[in-house]
């Protein structure tokens, strides 16, 4: 039997953190699985075979994207080429919608199984992205409680799993712990 191959794409530091935790969790369920993709040091330490480091995708704002577009486009094309070569059982896209939603369109046309983990905040802006999620993704996973209901009203089945970092803080922080005033300042 072939080892399960999973291709994961994160484009920023927060995605690298969540991706590393995801890889660790998936390895517990399937220790022989192989992980390939775009990530950072955390994902690589968790077992990801890097095809590109996120530091090469880190751009903020439209002007930075325009300035670095040739590099981003080259990475995009390389990603598609690597996915075609590796033929993963599943592709997991983590947040980073500007890149990952375009990638979802390309990969769906090639019949890949696509999971989107940490959904674009289409409820805040660019609601038009819902169509791409609906048409191109096989599974949608949310970390924000209200998204399951919100997306259901739009006709999408979303799995809510809770926030991956919630286990890092199991106590409530009070104003006194932060030494903040409990009465209005102004």
Where are these regions (language model features)?
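Active-site and donor-binding regions of nucleotide-sugar-utilizing enzymes
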Residues: 4-174, 178
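Single conserved hydrophobic/aromatic residue that forms the stacking wall/gate
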Residues: 177-186
């Amino acid at each position: 039997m072939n080892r399960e191959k999973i291709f994961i794409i994160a484009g920023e530091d927060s995605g690298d953190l969540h991706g590393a935790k995801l890889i660790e969790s998936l390895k517990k369920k399937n220790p022989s699985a192989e992980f390939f993709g775009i990530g950072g040091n955390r994902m690589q330490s968790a077992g990801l075979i890097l095809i590109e480091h996120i530091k090469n995708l880190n751009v903020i704002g439209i002007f930075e994207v325009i300035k670095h577009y040739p590099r981003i486009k080259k990475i995009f094309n390389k990603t598609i080429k690597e996915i075609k070569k590796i033929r993963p059982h599943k592709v997991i896209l983590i947040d980073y919608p500007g890149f990952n939603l375009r990638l979802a369109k390309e990969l769906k046309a090639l019949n890949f199984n696509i999971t989107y983990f940490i959904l674009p905040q289409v409820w805040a802006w660019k609601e038009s992205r819902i169509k791409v999620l609906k048409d191109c993704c096989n599974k949608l996973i949310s970390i924000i409680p209200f998204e399951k209901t919100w997306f259901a009203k739009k006709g999408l089945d979303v799995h809510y799993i809770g926030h991956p970092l919630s286990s890092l803080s199991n106590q409530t922080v009070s104003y006194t712990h932060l030494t903040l005033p409990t009465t209005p300042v102004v």
